[in-house]
Amino acid sequence: DVCEFRRVLEKSACLLLSEKGVPADERRQFEEILATMESADEKTLPALDRDFHTMLLRATGNSLMVTVLDAIAEVYQKWIDIVIRKTGKDEKNRLQAYHKGIYTSLAEADTDLALRFVDDHYDLIEEMLEL
C-alpha cells in the first residue's frame, strides 16, 4: 500500500513539475544528490534515496506533499533499507538510472518519460520487496 501511494504521489509531483518546471536551486540539489549516489555504499544510499524523493516533492512547491511524505517516511525507510541490502550491482545501477531518468526527463519537460521512470522505479522496488 505504501509503495502504491508513493508511486501515485510522485507521479503527481512529476505532473506538477512538468507544468511549473524544476526551479534552478532544486536542479542543483538534484544533480548533487545524483552525483553522490553514484559512489554511495549501502550505508549512505538509503539517506540519499530519501533525499532524492523528498526533493522531488519539495521542488513542486507543495508543502502538503512533503508533509505527507514525512508522515510515511519511517515505514517506507525500513523497506528501502531492506531493498538496499538485497540490491546487487545490477539493481543498484537500475535504481540509479531510474533516479537520473526521472530528473532528466523533468528537466527536459518530458512528462511521459518521467512517469515511465517512476513506474520502472517502483516496479523494481516492489520486485525487490518480494524476494
Each model region followed by its residue ranges:
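C-terminal all-alpha effector/ligand-binding and dimerization domain
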Residues: 31-34, 38-39, 47, 51-53, ...
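Exposed alpha-helical structural elements
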Residues: 1, 25-32, 64, 101
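Exposed, interaction-prone assembly regions rather than primary DNA-binding/catalytic cores
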Residues: 17-31, 35-37, 41-45
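Hydrophobic, amphipathic alpha-helical faces that serve as interaction scaffolds
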Residues: 1, 5-22, 50-89
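Short, solvent-exposed positions on alpha-helices
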Residues: 24-28, 43, 47, 63-67, ...
